[in-house]
């Protein structure tokens, strides 16, 4: 081990996603195998016992890279000196609750967490919001963190990206590692737009290998609604796959993608007609610790419609929480 210790915060630490996520972090899957880590676990008071039990198991796993664990119900403690934060904990939608109610309820979680990050985190802080509705929760946290650059707040759409890659690999009977330039535009919701326009497998255009009706009638809705499908089959929401995708996102953000495209939900700079500031899924590459939107792509009317639908959806979400954006 040659590098200084990195502090990594995880909220919702007693939950199912965190239970998979924390072991990957402790194993060195975010910063690498030469970087020791400290884990800072945040939970609500009612679930602090669960988080303490998770910490006990982490200690028992004797990870060489894991140097310390803090368990707390105070955001200012969890985010003290934090270099990377996974904001996983969020309020699930209750029976009969509208999406606007859910947005407001989560705003009361992510606003204070954004402020606590602003006041306590390290200068190189990177924040990935996993808790849903992730794009708008990230927007709320970002607005509350006035001194942190906006591009340090991302929402997780890597799960959607990975789901799309897996479905294409299965359909084509080809190695998923050969798939390039696939992207999911927009919101982490059932309205997202998985796009194969530029995607290739082993250098071949995927759009020429699959039927258009399959693409629009099966692939797009299956990727967009995969979470609901898993709940139907498993009886619980996606947890391990969400954790794995969160690791993928943060690892690539920090370490780069070697020019390969990844889907990342980041603050828009106005590219492709997406209003500046919306946290939106784009085709990106990571270089020097920053996501950069792939530029100068030609868009068909079909693509423009898919992007526009997501812009409308995210603008409506932003309007619903405008009082929380300060």
Swiss-Prot record:
One GO term (biological process): tricarboxylic acid cycle
Catalysed reactions listed for this entry: (S)-malate + NAD(+) = oxaloacetate + NADH + H(+)
InterPro entries: L-lactate/malate_DH (IPR001557), Lactate/malate_DH_C (IPR022383), Lactate/malate_DH_N (IPR001236), Lactate_DH/Glyco_Ohase_4_C (IPR015955), Malate_DH_type2 (IPR010945), NAD(P)-bd_dom_sf (IPR036291)
Record-listed E.C. numbers: 1.1.1.37
Catalytic residues (positions): 188 (proton acceptor)
Domain of life of the source: Bacteria
MF-aspect GO terms: L-malate dehydrogenase (NAD+) activity
Chain residues that bind NAD(+): 12-18, 106, 113, 130-132
Residues annotated to bind substrate: 93, 99, 132, 163
Keywords for the protein's UniProt record, in alphabetical order: NAD, Oxidoreductase, Tricarboxylic acid cycle
Record-linked PANTHER family: MALATE DEHYDROGENASE (PTHR23382)
Function: Catalyzes the reversible oxidation of malate to oxaloacetate.
Family: Belongs to the LDH/MDH superfamily. MDH type 2 family.
Name of the molecule in the record: Malate dehydrogenase
Source organism of this protein record: Corynebacterium diphtheriae (strain ATCC 700971 / NCTC 13129 / Biotype gravis)
Gene expressing this chain: mdh
């Amino acid at each position: 081990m040659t590098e200084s210790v990195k502090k990594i915060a995880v909220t919702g630490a007693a939950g199912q996603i965190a239970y998979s996520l924390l072991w990957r972090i402790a194993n060195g899957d975010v910063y690498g195998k030469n970087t020791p880590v400290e884990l800072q676990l945040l939970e609500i008071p009612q679930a602090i016992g669960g988080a303490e039990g998770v910490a006990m198991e982490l200690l028992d796993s004797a990870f060489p890279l894991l140097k310390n664990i803090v368990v707390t119900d105070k955001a200012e403690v969890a985010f003290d000196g934090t270099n990377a934060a996974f904001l996983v904990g969020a309020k699930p939608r209750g029976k009969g609750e509208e999406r606007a109610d859910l947005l407001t309820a989560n705003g009361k979680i992510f606003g204070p967490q954004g402020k606590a990050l602003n006041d306590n985190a390290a200068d190189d802080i990177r924040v990935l919001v996993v808790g849903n509705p992730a794009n708008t929760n990230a927007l709320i946290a970002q607005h509350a963190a006035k001194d942190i650059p906006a591009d340090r707040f991302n929402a997780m759409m890597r799960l959607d990206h990975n789901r799309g890659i897996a479905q294409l690999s299965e359909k084509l009977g080809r190695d998923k590692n050969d798939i390039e330039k696939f992207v999911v535009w927009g919101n982490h919701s059932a309205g997202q737009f998985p796009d194969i326009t530029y995607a290739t497998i082993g250098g071949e255009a995927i759009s020429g290998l699959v039927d258009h009706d399959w693409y629009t009638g099966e692939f797009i809705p299956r990727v967009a609604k995969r979470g609901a499908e898993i709940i139907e089959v498993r009886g619980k929401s996606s947890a391990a796959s969400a954790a794995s995708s969160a690791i993928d996102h943060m690892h690539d953000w920090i370490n780069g993608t070697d020019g390969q495209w990844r889907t990342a939900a980041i603050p828009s700079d106005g590219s492709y007609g997406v209003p500046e500031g919306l946290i939106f899924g784009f085709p990106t590459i990571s270089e020097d610790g920053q996501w950069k939107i792939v530029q100068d792509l030609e868009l068909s009317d079909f693509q423009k419609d898919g992007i526009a639908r997501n812009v409308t959806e995210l603008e409506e979400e932003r309007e619903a929480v405008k009082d929380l954006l300060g």
